[in-house]
Regions:
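Functional-site microenvironments in short loops/helix caps that host divalent-cation chemistry
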Residues: 1-168
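Conserved strand-loop elements at the edges of beta-sheets that form or border functional pockets
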Residues: 18, 177-180
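Residue-level signal for short, function-critical loop segments
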Residues: 100, 171, 190
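Polar low-complexity intrinsically disordered regions
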Residues: 147, 175-176, 192
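Short, P/G- and charge-enriched loop/turn segments at secondary-structure junctions
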Residues: 169-175
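Short, structured beta-strand segments at or near domain termini in extracellular proteins/domains
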Residues: 179-192
């Protein structure tokens, strides 16, 4: 975990990981911000407005774009990226990869740490997704609110298979349990 305590600053340049959903929400609230919705996150990660497979577009050479598969225990049963960078069993990188950049100028959406989003995790045939009204305007799945056990995580992370770098891939974790790959990206709404 990158956070070592309030008085220890050795890892301040690293992205915060090992967060719970509640902890990530509190970090954002302390800054006057919030977690993005899944829809906002996916829009940013799909090379908007072009709707690519990855934040950088459709180039499938994930290992040379995103900080994923960098651990000797890369998850997901797919190809590891050890040959494209160093093995890191400890955690995220300070800078991620320079190629992991969206058209909106957002860095590290495909790799480094996975990111909590506001939404409860539910399959797309669940009620929270079935009854959305059209046109869609930032839909959010809220089955049980803050009490919901599983929350959605988006994006790849340093020990994940390159599969997780795709903008449309969803993951989940227990909202109350800190997770080593889980980090936080805060957003602020436009307007008043």
């Amino acid at each position: 975990c990158t956070f070592l305590g309030l008085d220890e600053h050795a890892n301040d340049a690293f992205p915060v990981n090992c967060t719970s959903w509640q902890g990530a929400s509190e970090i954002c609230a302390a800054q006057g911000k919030r977690l993005p919705t899944e829809a906002e996150w996916e829009y940013a990660a799909s090379n908007a407005p072009s709707e690519g497979a990855y934040p950088w577009g459709d180039d499938a050479d994930v290992c040379n774009h995103a900080y994923v598969g960098r651990s000797s225990f890369a998850e997901g049963g797919s190809i590891a990226c050890h040959d494209a960078g160093t093995v890191n069993d400890v955690g995220p990188s300070i800078d991620g990869m320079p190629g992991d950049l969206s058209a909106l100028g957002i860095k590290n959406l495909a790799g480094n740490v996975a990111e909590w989003v506001q939404d409860d995790f539910a399959l797309y045939d669940a009620d929270c997704w079935k009854y959305v009204t059209f046109p869609l305007e930032n839909p959010r799945c809220a089955l049980g609110g803050d009490a919901q056990a599983d929350k959605a995580l988006r994006g790849g992370f340093w020990s994940a298979s390159p599969f997780y770098a795709r903008a449309v891939v969803r993951n989940l974790s227990d909202a109350k349990s800190p997770s080593a790959p889980a980090g936080v990206r805060c957003v602020k709404s436009w307007g008043p």
